[in-house]
């Protein structure tokens, strides 16, 4: 049988299931969560409300939202032994590696951590893990740098609480809003490498923690979540606005990838990037913003005709840099938001579960004869 027509490397444009959670219009550059445009949600909603929307398929009432926020707030703290583990980790541990280790440990001390995934279990544990990720990320950075552990404050929003724990003081309102918007924009993006990893593990009816750890491992990759760190390093490498054009054409000549440009689904400007750019213009370093803006013009002029345009990673790092967030934490912020989408897709998929089991097209030899080792050369 000739299977060539069934081969889709990278699973590009392969649909493995149906979903009510997210829709991407890659041609027009549109993104919807449960039918709501991401632009409207970023402007009017909050991360907590968006998590509720993604998980339960509707915008909450006032009482539903308040109860959900209370559940998140009371789940933010970390057990003493978790803090001790963070203190024992090697100081050169990548923040995503630290996050992976701590969440794995939380699964080990959760009495129901090994229960096979069901939608009910997914959301119950999801509240706890979603609430704890900012505490883990902020305090891992503090501990590794010899600073004191800062416990979370229940009165603060999810976004403000992260910045408070990281910096040791409550953030300005404009920082809180920018971080809240960032988490909304990172919350969900249909199926991608990390979401597929979560769904694949979940499809085996493993536990919630194992599924989420698979997503964290995938997101750590430099061409997935890690690209946000590489994009801002790229602007720093260029150094000044006057050097952008020379750098760009040299990069093209060397067939070097422009970090923050190009996307498997979007063939036009990423709608999330437009929103991040607005906040980068307000909060970002002025010189780096000018470098990025000049490089953006060249990307749009020379690469957009090939379907390569600006993606979410391009501007987001400038927003974080403007809030004095260390570059090494940028990918963990991605995870801080994307836990919402991972959890939603995990619950949706296991509600009608079928184990994910694709095929590989074999191109090797068959019928080879075994040769005893003494006769081999």
Swiss-Prot record:
Question: Which organism is the protein's source?
Answer: Pyrococcus furiosus (strain ATCC 43587 / DSM 3638 / JCM 8422 / Vc1)
What is the reaction catalyzed? Answer: oxaloacetate + acetyl-CoA + H2O = citrate + CoA + H(+)
Q: Name one GO biological process term.
A: tricarboxylic acid cycle
Catalytic site residues?
263, 313
Protein's name according to its UniProt entry: Citrate synthase
* EC class: transferase
Q: Does the keyword Transferase apply?
A: yes
Pfam families, per database record: Citrate_synt
Q: Which GO terms of the cellular component aspect does the record hold?
A: cytoplasm
Question: Which family does the record assign?
Answer: Belongs to the citrate synthase family.
Query: Which keywords belong to this entry?
Result: Allosteric enzyme, Transferase, Tricarboxylic acid cycle
Superkingdom, natural source: Archaea
InterPro entries, A to Z: 2-MeCitrate/Citrate_synth_II, Citrate_synth-like_lrg_a-sub, Citrate_synth-like_sm_a-sub, Citrate_synthase, Citrate_synthase_AS, Citrate_synthase_bac-typ, Citrate_synthase_sf
This chain is encoded by the gene named gltA
Q: How does it assemble?
A: Homodimer.
Stated EC number for the protein is 2.3.3.16
Alphabetically, the GO molecular function entries are: citrate (Si)-synthase activity
The pathway where this protein functions is: Carbohydrate metabolism; tricarboxylic acid cycle; isocitrate from oxaloacetate: step 1/2
């Amino acid at each position: 049988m000739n299977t060539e027509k069934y081969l889709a490397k990278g699973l590009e444009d392969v649909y493995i299931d149906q979903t009510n959670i997210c829709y991407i219009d890659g041609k027009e550059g549109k993104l919807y969560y449960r039918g709501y445009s991401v632009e409207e949600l970023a402007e009017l909603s909050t991360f907590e409300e968006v998590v509720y929307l993604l998980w339960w398929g509707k915008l909450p009432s006032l009482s539903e939202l308040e109860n959900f926020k209370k559940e998140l707030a009371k789940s933010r703290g970390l057990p003493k032994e978790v803090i001790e583990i963070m203190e024992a980790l090697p100081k050169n541990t990548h923040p995503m590696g630290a996050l992976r280790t701590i969440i794995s440990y939380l699964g080990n001390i959760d009495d129901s951590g090994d229960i096979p995934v069901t939608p009910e279990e997914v959301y119950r544990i999801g509240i706890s893990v979603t609430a704890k990720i900012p505490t883990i990320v902020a305090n891992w950075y503090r501990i590794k740098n010899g600073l004191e552990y800062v416990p979370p404050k229940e009165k603060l929003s999810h976004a403000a609480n992260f910045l408070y724990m990281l910096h040791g003081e409550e953030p300005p309102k404009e920082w809180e809003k920018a971080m809240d918007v960032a988490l909304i924009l990172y919350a969900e993006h249909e199926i991608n490498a990390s979401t597929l990893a979560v769904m694949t593990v979940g499809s085996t009816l493993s536990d919630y923690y194992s599924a989420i750890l698979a997503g964290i491992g995938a997101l750590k990759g430099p061409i997935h979540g890690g690209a946000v760190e590489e994009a801002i390093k790229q602007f720093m490498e260029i150094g000044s606005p006057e050097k952008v054009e020379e750098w760009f054409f040299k990069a093209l000549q060397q067939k070097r990838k422009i970090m923050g440009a190009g996307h498997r689904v979007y063939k036009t400007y990423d709608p999330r990037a437009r929103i991040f750019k607005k906040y980068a213009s307000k909060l970002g370093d002025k010189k780096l913003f000018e470098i990025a803006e000049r490089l953006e013009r060249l990307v749009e002029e020379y690469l957009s005709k090939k379907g390569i345009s600006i993606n979410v990673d391009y501007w987001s790092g400038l927003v974080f840099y403007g809030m004095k967030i260390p570059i090494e934490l940028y990918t963990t912020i991605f995870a801080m938001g994307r836990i919402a989408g991972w959890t939603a897709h995990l619950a949706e998929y296991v509600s009608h579960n079928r184990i994910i089991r694709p095929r590989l097209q074999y191109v090797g030899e068959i019928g080879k004869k075994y040769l005893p080792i003494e006769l081999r050369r």
